[in-house]
Each structure stands twice: as structure tokens, then as C-alpha cells.
Amino acid sequence: MPRKGTQPSTARRREEGPPPPSPDGASSDAEPEPPSGRTESPATAAETASEELDNRSLEEILNSIPPPPPPAMTNEAGAPRLMITHIVNQNFKSYAGEKILGPFHKRFSCIIGPNGSGKSNVIDSMLFVFGYRAQKIRSKKLSVLIHNSDEHKDIQSCTVEVHFQKIIDKEGDDYEVIPNSNFYVSRTACRDNTSVYHISGKKKTFKDVGNLLRSHGIDLDHNRFLILQGEVEQIAMMKPKGQTEHDEGMLEYLEDIIGCGRLNEPIKVLCRRVEILNEHRGEKLNRVKMVEKEKDALEGEKNIAIEFLTLENEIFRKKNHVCQYYIYELQKRIAEMETQKEKIHEDTKEINEKSNILSNEMKAKNKDVKDTEKKLNKITKFIEENKEKFTQLDLEDVQVREKLKHATSKAKKLEKQLQKDKEKVEEFKSIPAKSNNIINETTTRNNALEKEKEKEEKKLKEVMDSLKQETQGLQKEKESREKELMGFSKSVNEARSKMDVAQSELDIYLSRHNTAVSQLTKAKEALIAASETLKERKAAIRDIEGKLPQTEQELKEKEKELQKLTQEETNFKSLVHDLFQKVEEAKSSLAMNRSRGKVLDAIIQEKKSGRIPGIYGRLGDLGAIDEKYDVAISSCCHALDYIVVDSIDIAQECVNFLKRQNIGVATFIGLDKMAVWAKKMTEIQTPENTPRLFDLVKVKDEKIRQAFYFALRDTLVADNLDQATRVAYQKDRRWRVVTLQGQIIEQSGTMTGGGSKVMKGRMGSSLVIEISEEEVNKMESQLQNDSKKAMQIQEQKVQLEERVVKLRHSEREMRNTLEKFTASIQRLIEQEEYLNVQVKELEANVLATAPDKKKQKLLEENVSAFKTEYDAVAEKAGKVEAEVKRLHNTIVEINNHKLKAQQDKLDKINKQLDECASAITKAQVAIKTADRNLQKAQDSVLRTEKEIKDTEKEVDDLTAELKSLEDKAAEVVKNTNAAEESLPEIQKEHRNLLQELKVIQENEHALQKDALSIKLKLEQIDGHIAEHNSKIKYWHKEISKISLHPIEDNPIEEISVLSPEDLEAIKNPDSITNQIALLEARCHEMKPNLGAIAEYKKKEELYLQRVAELDKITYERDSFRQAYEDLRKQRLNEFMAGFYIITNKLKENYQMLTLGGDAELELVDSLDPFSEGIMFSVRPPKKSWKKIFNLSGGEKTLSSLALVFALHHYKPTPLYFMDEIDAALDFKNVSIVAFYIYEQTKNAQFIIISLRNNMFEISDRLIGIYKTYNITKSVAVNPKEIASKGLC
């Protein structure tokens, strides 16, 4: 926070937030980093940011938003928090040498002292460590912070250490320090105005210090932990909202604390992007509407042209059927001749001999394969048997280890029991000597007490003699009774001693039997537990053995089903992929169909009608070229629009037809005149291996290639004009060159091209394949259905995979449980047998140790007799003693002040005498029973040692057995490995034999094929077959001339091939010929514009392109708009949630501090808190509501403190430093604030500088600051401790 006279640091932390120090940790004026997201302060930077468009994707923008900051600490009881233990100042400001300030209390510490003594230097020292600039510590530069006085001059540096630790609060002032949580942060300033930071003695940068303190909850960003002198009332006086981008009001202050301020910048970015996308979308929408209007205008002519092409296609189909019918009839005749040839079969002796040899070789190889398979099966069986042996040995190993574990545990228990028995032996041996010492010591003490009793009785008698006149009668009666009581006392003591001795003898006599009964009870309980465990595990094994086969069977079925489903999924995915490619190819084919103009359309119509045969079509439509060369060939080849015909005569007929119909003019290429170019079409050597355009053209009919050479000649294509220039002007020859951009260099040297538009689209990139739009729609529907089915299969597969995983897990768990329970059954059986034996032994021991009934009865009768005797004597003595006490009490009441003290001494001595008598009796009983107990303990030692030897032998035997099992297992593993090593060689031999067998089979098949070929080579039928084949060839040629027109976006339809059944159904081919004539007549009557199809298609493609662009930008706009709305809602929700918590706590705090006032944070605009900001309104007690600016100094202070404590409730900070926050408060309010700090904020450490006694008197720790000889010193006291000792 700033010093006096400045704006409050909580309201202006952006301006005061210091930049980080240099990377090496040394700087001339280091200070904290400003909070993230608020680093740009100059206006120019803000303007630049607003002008530049953020082109990041929506995902990148959303991912760049940091998450809400986690709380560094909580208000929960028992939660750890940070506290300052003490501060060490070394030559800092007024502190010379090393001065320790503290220790500070975990809750409430007050710093007091006279003005000018250096109180504020305590906070300056903390600001110095926390990285504030020298100006913020009331100094011009860092070197001024070094102490300088008459006694201490020329000091080169000053250092401040702030020591921290993390604690967990307990009741009262107590707390628990979290282990290894202590650390300290120090900063050293030197004379050259540089400073360095250390954390626990290690040199660090300020960034490291800041991260460490922030991680422990110290709010360096908002400085809420620091309120300096004179600024407390200004915290609540912030404006509702900052007036500029870099100003901060109450709204921005709360936003940063709540954490929703991180969303402000992304919201601005998304808002700007939505505005820009709306503008772009409007442009795209206008383009769509324009293209749609143009497309609709062409639809009528397009439909007429399609009808014409459909009729022509029907003519071609019927011609195709007639030709196929003739081919089918000829093929039937050829098939009949082939049947005759097959009947003629020559015996081939050589082939049969070879076949017999191969058959014998196959038998031999089959025998070798069977022998090898026997070896392979034998080794495999051996490996499996060894694996089963290893599994059995592994189970035995588990059982032996369980037994060994039990025996080892038993040995340890016996060792402990032996140690205890030996200790008892030593104890019983020492009992007689100890008891005699006790008797001697007690007797000596008893004698001394008797003497002391006589003295005290004499003193009592003397006192009573002095009071004889007043109590003479009572005294005589009391003396008489006391004499009588003394006679009874000796009898009571003797009777009690006899009774105690008799009772001890009875207890000792019965102790061994009672111990045996206790051991038997424990053993029976262990036996019951072992039996129940064994029963449960056997039941579990039966249950698992029943469920495991079912689970395995279900798992196998599900795995097979999953495998089948996986294969089905793969097939469907492949099918969908192939179908998708076909659909895309069909759509592309429809989009690439070109229309023809009126002239070309009319010429093609004549061709279809048969009136002018020999017409091929437009040259550009008869070939294809890569899209890369589209501009080049469209620019340099004007002949692409020429019409190709068979001969010049046909070309002349076409010219005459155009003249008669007055349709227009056209240029024709006659193929009969193109043969002269055949020799020049071969590949040639070109400069720089530049490609020749002619070589790049693809054609369906090779006759057309001559026409393309006529049109292109040796024109070369270059990447750019520079290359074209180099290639065109060669020394020995000039070339005609065209660039990819359409620029042409002629052989004469002239150059053409350039301009704003280029020519393209006169030749397609692929040969046209006709397909209908209906077929495309069917393919798309099929693709959609197959995709849905693939998705369903995928979902079924996921569910099945989950079921298989669960079944595998269940199977594995059952197998492990079965193996573990099976291995433990034997151990439990042995344990049950052992416990049965132990119970029997203990039952025998109980019987053996059973006391003699007569002796027990005799001892019990002795105890009863002595007790009766004691009760009778005690009753008589009790009556006398009661009478003595009555008389004594009567006398005491009369002479209470004079006799009470003396009587108390006498009573105390009597009590000690009774204790001595009891001790002597117990010691005598112990001496009598020591020998008997010693013998029992020694017997127990011998039994335990024998059991230990037996157990050790059992451990050795089990260890040897375990070693033997391990050796057997190692041998089994060795044999298995040896067998597995030999397995690959035999497998390889087996594979080689199978391969040889396969070769023999292939040779045999080849021999059979040769035999069949020889049989078919009969010359007597070849002449007839050749004649029919010649006719078939003719009709095939006629079919090859037929091609269907591509119509709209339908897939290009291939000429259909009729099945034999369809061809058999044709009875009269002449009727089809008549139908063809009728269709041709209809076509001749129509006058369509075939170019309308291409024009309509172009407009439709453009329309779909524009619609796709519009959909794309609409989707993008909607995505950004939705993200914008979501972020605004998230920001509002986060802010209002924190706002309600803070304002409710503020109201509660203010009411408590003012004893009846009211305060709240109000939304200036209730619909949008971010538009006008937050207003702080206050109603002091017994006053009306007022704005914060209209309050007195004390009222502002209370309001600010209420807000500070409300923010602490919402976002706790472990430390608070406050400098004279009570300066503007009266006596009453100071007490209220002090009491509130003491009682309500128990989860934070408050260090307050105060001169008000009703503030610092209530604190838990006082830090006194005073100055002598220009040096500040300190002393820490605990006011409550001083008050409890009565020192103040």
C-alpha cells in the first residue's frame, strides 16, 4: 500500500504495481509485478489493440482463458495458514545492528511506541522485503534505507528477514506448526542502490519470491493485507466504475478479487469478431440471392435440352440391344462347336505317366509330414506337462510358505513369552529380600510414629487440661472410652491381619487354575474363528468352481461375437469409404460436363439422327488435361472449339446444313487429312525438358490424337515467363511456348497474354463419364443407410467390448481368489487340527490345575472365620470409636479454635500407623507365597524353551522343503526351456515339408491343365469358329461407336450389357429397328439449345458454392456469438455469486461494528452490473442512508473496515498489517473494532500499529518500539500473562 497522502493501494494497485526485477535478482529498484491482464497502461497500446483484429480460432481464444484462481486458504477450522513469527532488521533505517522484532502472536499483535520511535519502519521493513520501490518506503533511493547515525557510519548494506511458518490453529493461543513449513524471505540493499533477494538463504529473483508468497495466500496483487496510515477511510471511497480503461473503481476492484476480470478481454475479442462476421455474412447472402435469380432464369431451356438428350440416349440403347442380339446368336453357334471339340479326347500317355510320378511323390511327402507332426505334438505335450508340473510346484510352494510364516510367527511369540517368564523368575527371587526391607523400614517408621503420637497426645492432653473446667465431664468420659478403644484396636489389627493373610493364600492357590481357564477360553475362540474361516473358504471355492465355467463360456461366446462384429465393422467401413469415393466421383463428373452451343448442338443432332454420319464432336470435349494446364491450353489452342469429323466430305455436308438452317458458322477438322501428322506425333527432345502440351492430353479414341496434334503442334508449356523466354529463343530453333498463366510466345517472336482476365475451362481435367442425377441420389441414399448401419455396429461393438473387459476381469478375479483360497485350505486345516490339539491340552491343563475342593473349602472357611471374627471385633470397636468421636466432636465444638489443629495432627499420625500395619501384613504374605510362585515361573520357562526348540526345528524343516521345491521348479523350467528351444527347428522342418507338398500339388494341377489344353487343340473346327468370330468383331465395332449423353448431375451411364435371358427374350429384332426410326423422327422435330445445360450447371455450381460459403460463415458467426453470450453469462454469474457473499458479509460486519447501522454494495444498474458499476451506501446508526462520500472520517473508517473484513471472509488472507487505522475513531468505536478483530477474525494474523490504549490493551502480544541514542529497539510482552501475574 502507498504511504501517507497517497490514494489507497487497494484502489490503485495497477498504477503502483511494480515491474519484476532483472533475471539475476539484482536491481536498482525492485518491486512486485503488476497483476496479469492489466499490464498495458499507455493509451497508444490500447488503440493498437483495438485496431488489430484477433484472428485466432474460437478454440484458441477459449483455451487462452485462465481458470478461476484457487483459494490460497479457507475459513475452515483446522485448515493450515501462514503466520509471521518474527522480523530481523539489520542496519535498516533506524535499526542499527541486528534487531529482532517479535515474536508476533498468531492472531493479534499491536506495535506501540512514541512518535518518531520507528513504529512505521516495521511496516517499511516488510514492504522492503515484499519488493516495493524506495519511494513507497518513504525514501528516494534504496541506499537511503541503510542506517546512518553518529555511532554507526559507513555501513555498506542493510538486510531485512521476515520469518514465516505454517500452522494449524488449536484452542486458545496454542497451535501446531506443520513440519518443514518454516522459511524466511530476505532482501539486502547495498550502497550502489542494488538489491538481492534470498529464500531461506538461497539467492532468488523477485519473481520467485512473489510466486512463493502468493502460493501461501499473501495478496501481492491487490495489497489487501496492507492498510497504511491515513488511507483506511479511502478504501470504500472508490468510484462505482473506472472512468477510463486504466482507471479502477469499485466494480474493477471487486472483479479482480472475485476472479471474473479474466473474462473481460476475451469478451471484447468475441464481440468484435461477431460484428465483423455479421458484416461478412451480409455480403455472402447478397451474392447467393443474385446467383439464385440467374439460375432460375435458365431452367426452362435446360429442361428442353435434357428431354432431347434423353430421346437420343434411348435410340442408342435400342441400337445397342440389336447389336448384342446378333453377337449372342453367333456366340451360341460357337459354343455348340466347342462342345463337339470337348467330346473328342486324345489319350495322352506322357501326361498320365507324369501324373503317376507326382502322385507317388505326394504320398511320400504326406508320410514325412505325418512323422514331423508326431514329433511336434510330442514336444508340445511335453511342454504342457512341464507347465502343469510347475503350476503344482508353485501351489506347494505357497502352502509351505504359509506354514513357514505361521511357524516363524509362533517362534517370535514364544521368545516374547520366555522373556516374560524369565523376568517373573527374577522378580519372584527378589521378593523375600524386598519384603523384609519393607517390614524393617515400616516397623522403624511405625515406632517413630508411635513416639510422635505419644508426644502429640501429650500436647493434646495439655491443651485439654487447660480447658478442663469447661469440658471436665466430657473429657473424663472420653478418656474412659479411649482406654476401652485402645484395648479393641489391638484386637482389630490382629483380626484384620489374619483375614488378609488367609485371603492372599486363597487367591494364590486359585491363580494357576484361573490362568488355565483363561487360556482355554482364548484357544476355543481361536478354534471357532479358524473353523468358520475354513467353512467360508470351502463354500467360496464351490461357488467359484460353479461360476467360473459359466463365465469362461460366456467370455468365449462374447469374444467370438466381438471378433465377428469387428470384421463386420471393418467391412462396412470399407464399403462406406468406397461408396463415398464413388459418390464424390459421380458428383464431380456431373459438375464437369460441358454444354454445347447452338451450332455444335445442331451438328450433333444431325449425327444422332443419322442424316450426317461420321461426326465425332467438339475437339475440346474429346480429350482431357490436368487442371494445372487448363489456362495454358485454353489460351493457346483456338482449335478446341473446332468440330472433328471423319472426312472433308462430311465437313462439307455440315457446312451446307448450317447454311440451309441459317444457324451459324463452324470450323471442321477432317481426320482423313490428319494422317500426314502421324510421324511428327512421336516424342521429341525439348529445351530444359519442357513438356509438350500435346503429350499431356488424354484421349479415349486414339484416332483423335492426330487432330490434337494438328491443333497444338509442338507447343511447349513453361512454369513462368522467364522460363518461356529462355526456351523459346534457342540458337538452332525457335519454339512456340505458353506459360501456365496463359502468356504466349509465338515462333515469330511476338508475345501475347496478360490482362485482368485469363481464358480457362475450354477442356476438362478428365474424360466425361455420363451419369444421371437420380443415380447420384440413389448412391447418396445408400451411403447414408450404410453409414447409419456402420454407426450401429460401432455402438454394439463398444458395448460388447465393455462386457468382454468386465468378463475378463471377473474371470481373473475368480481364478486368483480360487488359487489363493485353495492354497490356504491346507494351512487352515492344519491350524484347525493344531487348535483342536491345543484345546484338548488346555482342557487337560485345566483339570490338572483344578484346586483341591477340600483345601479350597478349608481356605474359604478360614477366610470366612477370620472375616467373622474381624467383623465382630470391628463392630464393637466401631461403637466405642463412634462414641469417642461423638465426645471428641462435642469437645471440639466447644473448643474448636484451640483443639482442631492438634487433633488433625493426631488423626494424620493414626492414619499413617494404619498404613504401616497394612504394608507389613502385605509383605509377610508376599514372603509366604514367593517360593511357590518362583517354582511355577521356572516350570513355565522350561516348557517355553522346549516349545521354542520344537518350533525352530519345524522352521528348519519347512525351509529345507521350500529349497527342495525351488530346485524341482528350476529343473522343470530348465526342461521346458530346452524343449521350447528345439521346437522352432521342428516347426521349420514341418513348414518346409508343407511347402514342398504344395509345389507338387501345383505341378500336378499344371499337368492337368496341359492335358485339357491338348484336348481342345483340334484343327477340324477352327475354320468355322474363325468365321463366326469375324462377324462378332464387326458387331462389337458397331457397339463401340455408341455412347450415351451425360444428362445433368446423373452418373455417366455406360452401355448396358444384356444377360443371356434378356437376349433370349428378344424374338423379333426388326420391331426394335422400327422403334429406333420413330424416335429419330421425334428428335428431328425438336430444336433445343443444348448449351443451356452447361450454363445452368455453371450457375447451379456457383449457387451451391455461394450457399456453402454462406453456411460456413453463418456457422462461424453463430459459434462466436454463442461463445460470446456464454462468456458474458459466466462472467455475470461468477461476479454476482461473489458479490452477494461480499455484500451480505459487509452488511453483517457493519451492523456489528456500528451496533445497529446498515451498509450495502448496490448495483447502479440492476440489470447490468458492468454498465454503471457498484455504489457503496451506508446508513450510520440512527441516521438516514448516505453516500460514502458524505460520511465523517470515523464513519468512513468503519465502512472501509467492514468492507475489508467482508473481503477477508470471501477470500481469506493469512496476514494483515494496519497502521493507525483507529486514528479517526472515537473511544467507543476503537473498542468495537479492537474487539471485532480479536473475536471474529481467528483465521488470520493481525499486526496493527496503534496509539489507542483500548486497541492495544486487548491484543494478544505487544511489540514496544522505543529509540535511544538514535537507535530503535523493541521489546515484546504478553499483556495477558502480565495481568495474570498481577504486575499491572
Curated annotation (Swiss-Prot):
Family matches, as InterPro entries: P-loop_NTPase, RecF/RecN/SMC_N, SMC, SMC_hinge, SMC_hinge_sf
BP GO terms, sorted: cell division; kinetochore organization; meiotic chromosome condensation; meiotic chromosome segregation; mitotic chromosome condensation; mitotic sister chromatid segregation; positive regulation of chromosome condensation; positive regulation of chromosome segregation
Domain SMC hinge: 613-727
Tissue specificity remark: Widely expressed. Higher expression in testis, colon, thymus.
Cellular component per GO, a single term: condensed nuclear chromosome
Pfam (any one): SMC_hinge
Entry similarity comment: Belongs to the SMC family. SMC4 subfamily.
Protein name: Structural maintenance of chromosomes protein 4
The encoding gene: SMC4
